[in-house]
Amino acid sequence: MSIRDVYIVDAVRTPIGKFGGALSAVRPDDLAAHVVRALVDRSPALDPARVDDVFFGDANGAGEDNRDVARMAVLLAGLPVSVPGVTVNRLCGSGMEAVIQAARAIAVGDASVAIAGGVESMSRAPWVLQKPERAFPAGHQQLHSTTLGWRMTNPRMPAEWTVALGEGAELVADKHALSREQQDAFALASHQKAAEAWAKGLYDGEVVPYGGVDLARDECIRDSTSMEALAKLKPSFRPDGGTVTAGNASPLNDGAAALLLVDEAGLRETGREPLARIRASAVTGIEPQLFGLGPVQAVRRALDKAGRGFADLTTFELNEAFAAQSLGCLAEWPELDPAVVNPRGGAIAIGHPLGASGARLAGAVAHQLAAAGSGTGLAALCIGVGQGLALVLER
């Protein structure tokens, strides 16, 4: 059996909304359906019934995104009922995992046309109450927020593994001696690059606003922020001597993204030129408390699989969960030219809707490669509980 080439024909995303912001009244299954429908509408020559499967990442899945949000999106988007859908969860890497699983299906001949993406509504993530082990327990019961982080943790897990995500970022800052000023400068650059990219219209080809919502661009970008403004923010996780703040970490967000993946036959049916080709991917594990450094080995492994090196990269979308985490990874890739990293801004400015982010990054790289005409691109994320995920694209 020969392995087929896998092409990205198109990629779309919503503007990313802030927690409690413009998209907070929109259900996650409706967000997912919106990008699926937009993707299909942008390839009118392709019969929607030809979509062999829809893969969607979703990190929480405890609320309106329960019971296979991918399948719900298919139905809500008006695709034929014959089109199936599957939801995958690799936490922050869920959207990229969906892209990788769709690519694998096409590569081995199980599919010719697939949609892959991700969704998250952190605003609408519910509170949950753990079911007691016996009826009528005495005392108070605890509600858990499903928006972010550890909950109902297994007591067998070592305490050092289950630290808060922000404390994990502080551990990376400790490991690489990253100052507050370095982290704030990285965050400022993220906002500046994102604002400039929007001003130049660089996101016009991939962002599809949600109808009826007054949101045309990413909601968390702060055009006028400064080092002075960022310096006024208090540490969020270590009151004494901490360096991680709300200003140098990604916010809580709502959004969705989707990509159209095809083989050669599917490409002919669309009648379109592909944005990029999927070349390789890799996933690795690391100590859970150092999750922020998860991309370090995943990126090296993905590049090795692709037969490429850091010098070959023309663009690199690295998810900015925290400035400390991103800077820690960059410190472990001395061969990498930092100028190719997040040229249009990153998650600190754009936002990090957990299950959608990996698909957003993959789509961003594909669009950047298409704009350049040729090159090698990379997308990577750190993942809570200690993993890293990376994807190599080429054009």
Label every PLM stretch briefly.
Residues 1-26, 148, 228-293, 297, ...:
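Condensing-enzyme catalytic core mediating Claisen C-C bond formation in acyl metabolism
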Residues 14, 24-25, 29-34, 45, ...:
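N-terminal extracellular/periplasmic Venus flytrap/periplasmic-binding protein-like
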Residues 24-114, 118-137, 207-217, 289-290, ...:
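Conserved beta-ketoacyl condensing-enzyme motif
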Residues 26, 58-114, 146-147, 160-164, ...:
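Conserved catalytic cysteine-centered active-site region
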Residues 28-44, 69-73, 98, 165-172, ...:
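Short, well-ordered amphipathic alpha-helical segments that serve as non-catalytic structural scaffolds
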Residues 56, 167-170, 279-349:
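Active-site pocket-lining segment
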Residues 90-120, 173-202, 258-265, 331, ...:
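Active-site-proximal alpha-helical scaffold in enzymes
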Residues 113-171:
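Flexible glycine-/small-residue-enriched beta->alpha junction loops
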